UniProtKB/Swiss-Prot annotation:
Gene that this polypeptide is encoded by: rnpA
GO CC field: ribonuclease P complex
Species, as recorded: Bacillus cereus (strain ATCC 10987 / NRS 248)
UniProt protein name: Ribonuclease P protein component
Alphabetical UniProt keywords: Endonuclease, Hydrolase, Nuclease, RNA-binding, tRNA processing
Pfam families per UniProt: Ribonuclease_P
Length: 115
């Protein structure tokens, strides 16, 4: 993901947590905050140590980033998203993870995602 599509600072994460709306399924929690002044979307990832060791956590983050890269044309611009991975992600294949991510994005009200 390009730098303009990332959330890195703690205070930006906290703003999305406090002011944003959340949607969830068994694998993910997605917080979403509208920012009309922003020309593109931004994504922040959070994978807890409870999920597994560093290898597992980094694998999950890589798969989420790859899914976002493939879906970037369908994700609404002008929004910040924080994606929190839950325990079941550790055993999922890439296809299952992407399908679950699409499902939770659709639940959050994104109409453009069709896959």
């Amino acid at each position: 993901m390009k730098k303009k599509h990332r959330i890195k600072k703690n205070d930006e994460f906290q703003t999305v947590f406090q002011k944003g709306k959340s949607n969830a399924n068994r694998q993910f929690v997605v917080y979403q905050l509208d920012k009309e002044e922003q020309p593109n979307f931004r994504i922040g990832l959070s994978v807890s140590k409870k999920i597994g060791n560093a290898v597992v956590r980094n694998r999950i983050k890589r798969m989420i980033r790859q899914s976002i890269t493939e879906l970037k044309d369908e994700i609404d611009s002008g929004k910040d998203f924080v994606i929190i991975a839950r325990k079941p992600c550790a055993e999922m294949t890439y296809e299952e993870l992407k399908k679950s991510l699409i499902h939770v994005f659709k639940r959050s009200g994104m109409k453009r995602i069709k896959k």
